[in-house]
């Protein structure tokens, strides 16, 4: 009887050992639909949030901004994993004439998650197709972003796919919405002349209007070169400030606001894709280049445009190519 009892006990233990993994597998299988359901619910909630936030931004822009007419641009689509954008800071001079206060070309590499920024000095003396020689920023007033793109291509070999014209009000609104606590900037000197605000030397958190004034200041020995340097500093700081959850979750609403204050031919999908990739996964440091590069230009006085920068085109074209192609 003892032997029979031992045999029965052995069989029960064997059955328990073999059935335990099966029960665990069944539990895992039962949990799988629940997990999938939770994922689906979260995705639906995310889509609803994005749509609601975007529409909220659009409604905000409708109340505070004017209708924006998209320009013809016809930039070449390259399909190389990179997006290049001609970014223009626009103001209206007396009489309503639109002018560019800053000219930048921004390239984002989706594969390597890197951003590069190139500032083009607005006083470059350039060949403007159909208009002869003038300062390069005159191209925008004469023919909008499209003519400026053609001018950049002819003189510097730059031919971006998209454009974005940011008016000053739009810049202020976007900064205040994204970063209500202000943007940390080390103001290197007291600034006030022709910028609409008074800034004191030292470390400060600047709101949208103050940050715009800082980026526009040019009344010091550096002149326009100093302004370009500060604009690049602002872009670097904004990139670093964007890499946090509180800012990223606001991107859909900001994209909606963009539609009211930024004149651009970038589709909504492109704004979302670039913004999320840049804000979440992109490198914190943005590589920058100022055109013309050092020792490649001279100051000249022109009959039509006054003081301007006469550049060595070949030297600058090669520097631009090396900068954009560098990994």
UniProtKB/Swiss-Prot annotation:
Residues 1-18 have a biased composition (Basic and acidic residues). It is found in: Cell membrane. The keyword Protease does not apply. The chain crosses the membrane at residues 32-52. It comes from the Bacteria. Pfam families: LytR_cpsA_psr. Residues 1-24 are annotated as: Disordered. Residues 53-327 are extracellular. Residues 1-31 are cytoplasmic. One of its GO terms (cellular component) is plasma membrane. Keywords: Cell membrane, Membrane, Signal-anchor, Transcription, Transcription regulation, Transmembrane, Transmembrane helix. Belongs to the LytR/CpsA/Psr (LCP) family. PANTHER family: POLYISOPRENYL-TEICHOIC ACID--PEPTIDOGLYCAN TEICHOIC ACID TRANSFERASE TAGU, REGULATORY PROTEIN MSRR. This is Regulatory protein MsrR.
